[in-house]
Amino acid sequence: MLSRLFAPKVTVSAHCDLPCGVYDPAQARIEAESVKAVQEKMAGNDDPHFQTRATVIKEQRAELAKHHVSVLWSDYFKPPHFEKYPELHQLVNDTLKALSAAKGSKDPATGQKALDYIAQIDKIFWETKKA
């Protein structure tokens, strides 16, 4: 009796963990822009409390950017994309490494490098959306 009460009524499945069409590299770009902006602000303020707060925010935003790039790589891009863009695996890896470097640095050049990589992913992403 109890087993029927708690048994699933409907079984569903999906090919992804998000509804289709939600993916967009803009999410990663916005977070990476925040990282670079914080790095620039850190250069102009020596207050130790500000530096601590800025470091926490910068690290959080870098992790969010890494998350969004990882979701694109693992959930959006499919084998046909990797066949058409064989550089995509390395590009994602380089982007994640650049975001890690920006996370651990006050130098806005590291934030810009991450943004440059994200721009390359963005270009490929929108090309795949046209197909």
From Swiss-Prot:
Residues 1-14 form a propeptide. Its EC number is 1.15.1.1. Disulfide bonds: none annotated. One of its GO terms (molecular function) is nickel cation binding. One of its GO terms (cellular component) is cytoplasm. The keyword Metal-binding applies. Ni(2+) binds at H15, C16, C20. It holds the Pfam family Sod_Ni. It catalyses: 2 superoxide + 2 H(+) = H2O2 + O2. It comes from the Bacteria. SUPFAM superfamilies: Nickel-containing superoxide dismutase, NiSOD. Its cofactor is Ni(2+). It is found in: Cytoplasm. Belongs to the nickel superoxide dismutase family. Homohexamer. The hexameric protein has a roughly the shape of a hollow sphere with an outer diameter of 60 angstroms and a large interior cavity. This is Superoxide dismutase [Ni]. It comes from Streptomyces coelicolor (strain ATCC BAA-471 / A3(2) / M145).
